Amino acid sequence: MLVYIAGSGAMGCRFGYQISKTNNDVILLDNWEDHINAIKENGLVVTGDVEETVKLPIMKPTEATQEADLIILFTKAMQLPQMLQDIKGIIGKETKVLCLLNGLGHEDVIRQYIPEHNILMGVTVWTAGLEGPGRAHLQGVGALNLQSMDPSNQEAGHQVADLLNEANLNATYDENVVPNIWRKACVNGTMNSTCALLDCTIGELFASEDGLKMVKEIIHEFVIVGQAEGVELNEEEITQYVMDTSVKAAHHYPSMHQDLVQNHRLTEIDFINGAVNTKGEKLGINTPYCRMITELVHAKEAVLNIQ
């Protein structure tokens, strides 16, 4: 198969690197000039569990011409419409498009560009880091769940899961992936935005009595909105999952902290807490915590003059 990685940041590099070890062809797509040039000149430098430099083709999305068998979307959520516009030319009748973006509502965006027959939605707990242009730090293990959005095209989902398992990415075909997507979004909604606003680690947030109260209110808002949309969510189970995750990740600053506080980049808040607030408004459900957190993050972006 010819596999394109649409958005070759840390996670895109992980998937591209691991898939390149199989009998499939991989092309990385990105718009970051320094990253493109570094990989073209020196290869992708991988550190962490393995130390290796691999030659991988990389180009801008608009430069790709060869029809794809599989496209894995890893772009930032706010860049998704532009990416889909840029790669329209490589999407054929049977091209499979797998979305592994964090957050909620991406399937609605993707459907505007791609028939449902071609769309796969998924969620992953793999992690990765970028140490600079062309340098990916890959440590630890993960897994992912995926599902075909078209019930009549489950075979495509199983094919993609098989390919990802060849690359040791621990993929499972999931008959009902949407609750897992919401559960991960809820983890991000309780940790990412809050730690970014409070400038603290996950452990510091959860050690605070007020922090923990806020976390539980956020979980409740995610659950009631998700349930109103018909998603099977159990508040007790999700609360336990969030608590367990907070223990494992106690020393980490989450990715939104890196974006907002450390690197002064725009965040994906509109696709996490903001998505719950927007959905809640449409459903007549009040979500005061998600609304306030979204407004505070946007205010912080404005204060820092992030464009």
Curated annotation (Swiss-Prot):
<dbReference type="GO" id="GO:0008677">
    <property type="term" value="F:2-dehydropantoate 2-reductase activity"/>
</dbReference>
<dbReference type="Pfam" id="PF02558">
    <property type="entry name" value="ApbA"/>
</dbReference>
<dbReference type="InterPro" id="IPR013332">
    <property type="entry name" value="KPR_N"/>
</dbReference>
<feature type="binding site">
    <location>
        <position position="102"/>
    </location>
    <ligand>
        <name>substrate</name>
    </ligand>
</feature>
<keyword id="KW-0963">Cytoplasm</keyword>
<comment type="similarity">
    <text>Belongs to the ketopantoate reductase family.</text>
</comment>
<dbReference type="GO" id="GO:0050661">
    <property type="term" value="F:NADP binding"/>
</dbReference>
<comment type="pathway">
    <text>Cofactor biosynthesis; (R)-pantothenate biosynthesis; (R)-pantoate from 3-methyl-2-oxobutanoate: step 2/2.</text>
</comment>
<protein>
    <recommendedName>
        <fullName>2-dehydropantoate 2-reductase</fullName>
        <ecNumber>1.1.1.169</ecNumber>
    </recommendedName>
</protein>
<feature type="binding site">
    <location>
        <position position="255"/>
    </location>
    <ligand>
        <name>substrate</name>
    </ligand>
</feature>
<keyword id="KW-0521">NADP</keyword>
<feature type="binding site">
    <location>
        <begin position="7"/>
        <end position="12"/>
    </location>
    <ligand>
        <name>NADP(+)</name>
    </ligand>
</feature>
<feature type="binding site">
    <location>
        <position position="102"/>
    </location>
    <ligand>
        <name>NADP(+)</name>
    </ligand>
</feature>
<dbReference type="InterPro" id="IPR013328">
    <property type="entry name" value="6PGD_dom2"/>
</dbReference>
<keyword id="KW-0566">Pantothenate biosynthesis</keyword>
<dbReference type="InterPro" id="IPR013752">
    <property type="entry name" value="KPA_reductase"/>
</dbReference>
<dbReference type="GO" id="GO:0015940">
    <property type="term" value="P:pantothenate biosynthetic process"/>
</dbReference>
<comment type="function">
    <text>Catalyzes the NADPH-dependent reduction of ketopantoate into pantoic acid.</text>
</comment>
<dbReference type="InterPro" id="IPR036291">
    <property type="entry name" value="NAD(P)-bd_dom_sf"/>
</dbReference>
<feature type="binding site">
    <location>
        <position position="192"/>
    </location>
    <ligand>
        <name>substrate</name>
    </ligand>
</feature>
<dbReference type="InterPro" id="IPR003710">
    <property type="entry name" value="ApbA"/>
</dbReference>
<dbReference type="InterPro" id="IPR050838">
    <property type="entry name" value="Ketopantoate_reductase"/>
</dbReference>
<dbReference type="GO" id="GO:0005737">
    <property type="term" value="C:cytoplasm"/>
</dbReference>
<keyword id="KW-0560">Oxidoreductase</keyword>
<dbReference type="Pfam" id="PF08546">
    <property type="entry name" value="ApbA_C"/>
</dbReference>
<feature type="active site" description="Proton donor">
    <location>
        <position position="184"/>
    </location>
</feature>
<dbReference type="InterPro" id="IPR008927">
    <property type="entry name" value="6-PGluconate_DH-like_C_sf"/>
</dbReference>
<feature type="binding site">
    <location>
        <position position="188"/>
    </location>
    <ligand>
        <name>substrate</name>
    </ligand>
</feature>
<feature type="binding site">
    <location>
        <position position="268"/>
    </location>
    <ligand>
        <name>NADP(+)</name>
    </ligand>
</feature>
<feature type="binding site">
    <location>
        <position position="128"/>
    </location>
    <ligand>
        <name>NADP(+)</name>
    </ligand>
</feature>
